[in-house]
């Protein structure tokens, strides 16, 4: 699958180091090598959203939007946030807006 990244996601990744950064890199490689969403480990569709999914990466959560297109399947990584912040209203509202 193709992958794209938001500025927020890229900014969060730049702040990482060590094992966490390697885990994020490995997850992105797994997504690129996957032919469907079922092949991505720890990937779950969020309840109440049409196209929003999350991947658990240790104590972090990567949220992405997946629109199935006839020509290309593309995973757009939107946010990478700590688990405690992942389900706050702030991100919930942002994801709802982006889900449309």
Spans of model-derived segments:
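Arg/Lys-rich, positively charged N-terminal/basic patches that mediate binding to nucleic acids
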Residues: 1-27
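A short, surface-exposed loop/turn module that caps and links secondary-structure elements
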Residues: 29-54
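Residues that recognize and position ribonucleotide moieties
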Residues: 2-3, 53-55
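Active-site micro-motifs of SAM-dependent methyltransferase domains
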Residues: 11, 30, 82-85
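Short histidine-centered beta-strand/loop micro-motifs
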Residues: 15, 46, 55-56, 67
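A residue-level signal for beta-strand positions that form part of recognition/binding surfaces
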Residues: 2, 43, 74
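Residues that form or immediately flank small-molecule/cofactor binding pockets and catalytic motifs
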Residues: 8, 48-51, 82
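Enriched for short, Lys/Arg-rich terminal
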Residues: 57-61, 65-100
